[in-house]
Amino acid sequence: METEIWKYIDELAKRIKRIIIVFIASLLAFLAIPSPSPFGIKGSSILFYDTLIFWIIRKMEEAYLPPDSKLIVISVTAPLFAILQMAFYLSLIIAIPVAFREIYAFVSPALYRREKAIIKKYLLPFSLLYLTGMIYTIIIVLPLTFRALIFLYYHLNIELFINLNDFINIVILMVILGGLLFALPTLVLPLIEAGILGTRTLSKNRIFIYLIIAFIASLISPDPTFLSVIPLLIPIYALYEATIYFGRIIEKKHSKVS
């Protein structure tokens, strides 16, 4: 018995080690990978080597902020922390799929064949919906969010200065949130298929769940008017209703089989 426990602990340690290695390798790679024009900013000197992280931050600034706004830092070390922060988030995005794969490989021997089939069935839809949510947030939600915020500042006649670290946090967290919220159906439908959750519960608590989703989105969004969050909530609520619809189909199939 004790030997079996240590065997599982050793297996778990190996899989955690793989996740950490992927994360650290991604972190170092993002800090070292050159931008599309690595010496195109201030000359050809190695002192002005331009990394992919710098390039991404500049593109974010160009996409979401007006030309007369300024990104500021409040300490000497803030730019360094901003670079590490961006590299950390990007590395996390790379490491998360690896973590899911390793977790599944660890627990799969204890799962029944039907449970394995359910998990495998929703892996691709989860990835596609998560990616769609991130792209939708980048293209639609974030521009509207910053436009609403800037509109408010201009009408109050306030000059716009945005903290670099806050800017990165807002963008990355909203992108991750958008991806996760879009992927919710692929997390709920397996629970319905496994008989753990029912569509009646989802229908009964619909308003409460809508309010929770809206509250979480408003916490991350910097827009105090809440208007820019609406384009994110509309497709998510539509996906929630679609989840209930397909969940009922699954329940009917199960009732016929039984």
Positions of predicted regions on the chain:
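Membrane topogenic/interface segments and analogous intrinsically disordered interaction regions
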Residues: 1-258
